[in-house]
Each structure stands twice: as C-alpha cells, then as structure tokens.
From Swiss-Prot:
Annotated source species: Borreliella burgdorferi (strain ATCC 35210 / DSM 4680 / CIP 102532 / B31) (Borrelia burgdorferi)
Keywords, alphabetical: ATP-binding, Chaperone, Nucleotide-binding, Phosphoprotein, Stress response
Basic and acidic residues: compositionally biased ranges: 620-635
Membrane-traversing stretches: none
Name of this protein: Chaperone protein DnaK
Sequence similarity: Belongs to the heat shock protein 70 family.
Taxonomic lineage from the root: Bacteria, Pseudomonadati, Spirochaetota, Spirochaetia, Spirochaetales
One term of GO molecular function: ATP binding
Length: 635
C-alpha cells in the first residue's frame, strides 16, 4: 500500500505531512515553507498561481485572487452574505443555488471545491516531490462543526485534485492525535481551535491509545479573518476622518489594507504597538494620499473583544455536554494561528482556570494528526483508535410536527440507528421522509437537510405497514438515510448532499433556542403525544367494537361508545388534561373488548401457541409522521 498523506486544508494556510519510520513529518513546499497560503490566483494571461506566488500578486490582482474559499465550501449563496462583504472577488449564485466565484481573467464561474482542489494539488505535488513517488490517497481535515454538505464538498475537492479521500477528520481531533501520540497516561484534554475562518472546541479523553471525543461545539463563521476585518474597518474609518476619502469601494486599496491588517495583528501578539504605513493608498485632485497609523494592542483588544467573547459560550457548552467541569480538564491545547493572540490566551485561561499547553505547533498540529490517521489506516501506526462524534442531532418529522431524533448530538461515529414507523391513515401507499438536523423538539424549529418519498406501500389499515427508517453516519461524518417497507422489501435511500452550510445565526438559534425553550418544547410535545394517543385509542377501539360487537353486552357497548364520544369532544376542545383523563376512562371501559379478544384468541389458537410460543400484542401507540412508531431498534 502506498503512502496516505495528511492534509490540513486551512482557511488561511494549508499544510501536508506523512508518517515516516513511525514518526509524523511535515513536508516543506517548493518555496521552502512548511505551510502554504490557501490562495489561488489567475493572471490576465489565464495562468493559475497557487500558494505564496499567488499571495505575492494579490494587491495588484484583487478580483482574480481567491483566498478564504473555505468559508464558501458547501454553502448556499443566501447563506454567505457576511462573507461576501469580506472579499474583493465576485461571488455569484450558481445554477444549483450554491455560492460560486466569477473569475474575470478566465471568464469562468468556479465552485469552491474546484478552487480548493488547486491548493490540494499543490499539497499533493509537495508530497510527491519529497517521496519521489505518486500519491493518490489522503486524509483531509475539516472543522468539527462542518455539516454534511461542507464535508462532502471537501471530499469533492480531493477527488478533483486526483486524491482518494480515505478519511475526513475533525481538526481538533487531529490536533489531539498530534499531542497524544507519545502520551501513555490517561487524561482529559480540550482542543481550542481558532483558525482563519472557523472556531472549534472539542473535549477528548485520551488513554491506552484510544482517543475518544466526548463533545464538540463551535462556530463556522468565526476566525482570524474576522479579526483582520475589524482592523480594516477601523483603518477605513480613521482615514475617512482624516482625508474625507472612503476606501471601502477601492478593491486594490482594500487588498493592501487586508495585508497590512494581517501583518499588524501578528505583530501585536509580540509587541504593544504596530505601525501601519501604506504610501500612495489613493489619490484625489490634490495629489497622492498616504495612510500612516499606529495601532496599539490595547486598541486592538478593544476592537475585537466581542469576537474573543464569542468563543466562550461554545467552550462552556462543550464542557457541559461532556458531563465535566472545567477543573476536570487536564490540558488545554491551542490550535490555529489566531490562538497566538494574547487576548485569546487570556480568555482560555479564564474559561479553563489554567494556562494553555503550548507544546504543539498551532500551524502544523492538524496536518500531523491527519498523517497519524493515515498511518492508522495503513497499519503503520499501531495501537491507536480514534472515536469521533457528530456535532448535531439528526431525526425525522413525525405526526403533529414533532422531531423524532434517531441520533443524538455528540454520538460516537460511525453509527447506525433504526426505528420502525407505520402509516397514519388507512390505505396510505406512500410516506414522505423529512430529514432534520437540530436540537429543538418541533420539526419546524430545526433545519431540513433533505426529504424523499417511499411509495409502493400496499394499501392496508393504518398502523399495519412497517417502515424501517435508518440513519447511517460514516466515519467521515457524512449522513445516509434509508426507508424500507419491511412487508415488500422495497427500499429508498438518500445521501444528504443537498444541504448547505449552517449560518452562524442558524447554529446559534438551534442550540440557544433549544435551551431557552426546553420547557415550552417539552409541553408542546407532550400535548401532541396525548392527542396522538387519544386518536389511536379511538381508532383501535372502534375497529375492535365492530369486530366483537356480537360478543359483548349492549350495556358494555353503550358505555364504550359513550366514552368514545366524550373523548372526541375533548379533542375538539383541545383541553389536554381532559383528553388525558378521558383517554384513561376509555381504556378502562374497553377492557371488556380486550377480555373477549383474549378469550377468543385462547380458544382458537391454543395449538398454534404451543408450537410457536405465546402471541404478543405489540401494537403500540406511538409517534406518527405520515406514520406512527410501532417499534424501535435499541442499538
């Protein structure tokens, strides 16, 4: 088997590593750098430039130099409004609704995976030059909070680059592998990963070569780019006050400001102030204008404090989801170039009550971890097991608009969960399966990832057909859903790849609303279930009453019919307490039918029961979509 390379496909920079003689090695690129700028440019001659050479000409070619493309991976055009404002190149809506880049120098609209593939190709060629052999397989990392579409887009980029992506690994998990490869004792670590475009926090338990993720959280719209953007906005504002000239619409000036902002941010990690000098930034009737400004660390920290604070809540949630206290964490590992910012290191200390561990290189740890995972897959790295998780719950919509969760968030992957449903109406021949992602009890308050229809179900009374719905999340975190009519064997499958990236507000809403409205959701769900139970009992009782009407007394029959009528009236009034009490009354009144059914069954099937074992009545009132739950696979 050939080498499987490990690639950190970053927002700002990318890095490639391999396992060599049992040790991970970071490979230098052709320019001598251990990391490569994730930048792709097209010259006016149509030539493609990748990495540092692309970065070198970005000021003079802003509209055809693509950076931070990771922010657009797997996202719909409507979801990237804030990102569009941060880049000088043109983002358009693709035919399928996704975000595309219009590159004027080659008169072409390109997808984010196509552009990312250029960076991956550079990483592939870097590894091939070092190894002296062809490379066809890779492990590529993604932010832990990347959704299914973003993961799929990353796999697509690998395929375009000529790589078979053997595994998609979450970045914090990869960093933990890099940290723990030589650790023998058990410990709990937190990985705080603030990169160029995304933020992740993961809590892991390490011990005996097992790396088990306990929880993960994050924000796919928060990273170093946002810190740069705050400096840019401040410089534009100050320059406008001084010269009455607005630089915000000058793309070449913006590119120079971007470069200067990034440089100042880096400088302020080690100094108390940074000088920004941009001669000939623009010109007016009076001649050329120069931008000169001194940015202090105190002013910078004031400007970005709201961004720093945004990392706190995900950390607290991850600790809570792991069932731990901050004091239980043995080490906090910092990953991503933005963690060099002193204000970030301070908030990490405030959250976890300890100084962060600086033993891993924040720029290289993720690629090293990816290489280790590659070694695990080839068998070169032995006695190491990686257990990752899915970041958000997955389920389907059931009767009354309820979300029935099949896989809870922070479930270890790969995993497969199944549940058996049935039809909600007599002679129903198809069901519409709506696949949801989120934490709320009601379907409408979660995100629809996709839907599909299972048809060809034989006409039968409701509750009779058995439809098994299965959710399968592979080791890459990619979701597959299937529905199977257990009577006919007919099956329908879907791989969720039509979904796009969750926006910052959507992720925030899913989790925050779930906590804020937990009681409200619980009550609403209980009310719907009470109505479903009542309706199901009425249906079953009326059906049995017809079947056994001749075998029960007229008095019992009248009593049962009276209770059915009363329960129907309470359903019309939507009085939940009355519905519950009258449901109990009808259940008690219908015991007479149950007695008749049992007596009849005992007489007619005595011989059959001796041969096949006791017949159990497993009919069960349950949740209904276009169907109701009749069984559950408790894996």
């Amino acid at each position: 088997m050939g080498k499987i390379i490990g690639i950190d496909l970053g927002t700002t920079n990318s890095c490639v590593a391999i396992m060599e003689h049992g040790k991970p090695v970071v490979i230098q690129n052709s320019e001598g750098g251990r990391t490569t700028p994730s930048i792709v440019a097209y010259t006016n001659k149509g030539e493609r430039l990748v990495g540092q050479v692309a970065k070198n000409q970005m000021v003079t070619n802003p509209e055809n130099t693509i950076y931070s493309i990771k922010r657009f991976m797997g996202r719909r055009f409507e979801e990237v409004a804030s990102e569009i404002k941060m880049v000088p190149y043109k983002i358009e809506k693709g035919l399928n609704g996704d975000a595309r880049v219009n590159i004027s120098n080659i008169k072409k609209q390109m997808s984010p995976p196509e552009i990312s593939a250029a960076t991956l190709t550079k990483m592939k060629e870097t590894a091939e030059a070092y190894l002296g052999e062809k490379v066809t397989e890779a492990v590529i990392t993604v932010p832990a909070y990347f959704n299914d579409a973003q993961r799929q887009a990353t796999k697509d980029a690998g395929k375009i680059a000529g790589l078979e992506v053997k595994r998609i690994v979450n970045e914090p998990t990869a960093a933990a592998l890099a940290y723990g490869i030589e650790k023998k004792h058990e410990e709990i670590v937190a990985v705080y990963d603030l990169g160029g475009g995304t933020f992740d926090i993961s809590i892991l338990e390490l011990g005996d070569g097992v790396f088990e993720v306990k929880s993960t959280n994050g924000d796919t719209h928060l990273g170093g780019d946002n810190f740069d953007d705050e400096i840019i906005k401040h410089l534009i504002s100050e320059f406008k006050k001084e010269s009455a000239i607005d630089l915000s619409n000058d793309k070449m000036a913006l590119q120079r400001l971007k470069e200067a902002a990034e440089k100042a941010k880096i400088e302020l990690s080690g100094a108390q102030e940074a000088s920004i000098n941009l001669p000939f930034i623009t010109a007016d009737a009076n001649g050329p204008k120069h931008l000169q400004y001194t940015l202090t660390r105190a002013k910078f920290e004031q400007m970005v404090d709201h961004l720093v604070q945004k990392t706190k809540e995900p950390c607290l949630k991850a600790i809570k989801d792991a069932g731990l206290k901050a004091s239980d964490i043995n080490e906090v590992i910092l990953v991503g170039g933005s963690t060099r910012i002193p204000a970030i290191q301070k908030i990490v200390k405030d959250i976890f009550g300890q100084d962060p561990n600086k033993g891993v290189n924040p720029d290289e740890a993720v690629a090293i971890g990816a290489a280790i995972q590659g070694g695990i897959l080839t068998g070169e790295t032995k006695d190491m097991v990686l257990l990752d998780v899915t970041p958000l719950s997955l389920g389907i919509e059931t009767l009354g608009g309820v979300m029935t969760k099949l896989i809870e968030r922070n479930t270890t992957i790969p995993t497969k969960k199944s549940q058996v449903f049935s039809t909600a109406a007599d002679n129903q021949t198809s069901v519409d399966i709506k696949v949801l992602q989120g934490e709320r009890e009601m379907a409408a308050q979660n995100r629809i990832l996709g839907n599909f229809i299972l048809d060809g179900i034989p006409a039968a009374p409701r509750g009779v057909p058995q439809i098994e719905v299965s959710f399968d999340i592979d080791a890459n975190g990619i979701v597959h859903v299937s529905a199977k009519d257990m009577g006919t064997g007919k099956e329908q499958k879907i791989r969720i790849e039509s979904s796009s990236g969750l926006s910052e507000s959507e992720i925030d809403r899913m989790v925050k609303d779930a906590e804020a409205h937990a009681e409200e959701d619980k009550k609403l769900k209980e009310n719907i279930e009470a109505k479903n139970t009542a309706n199901s009992l009425i249906y079953q009782t009326e059906k049995s009453l017809k079947e056994y009407s001749e075998k029960i007394s007229s008095e019992d029959k009248e009593a049962i019919e009276s209770k059915i009528k009363e329960l129907k009236e309470s359903l019309e009034k939507e009085d939940i307490s009355l519905i519950k009490s009258r449901t109990e009354e009808l259940q008690k009144a219908s015991y007479k039918i149950a007695e008749m059914m049992y007596k009849d069954s005992s007489q007619q099937n005595a011989n059959s029961q001796q041969e096949n074992g006791p017949q159990s009545n497993t009919s069960e009132e349950g949740k209904e979509a276009d169907y109701e739950v009749v069984d559950e696979d408790k894996k």
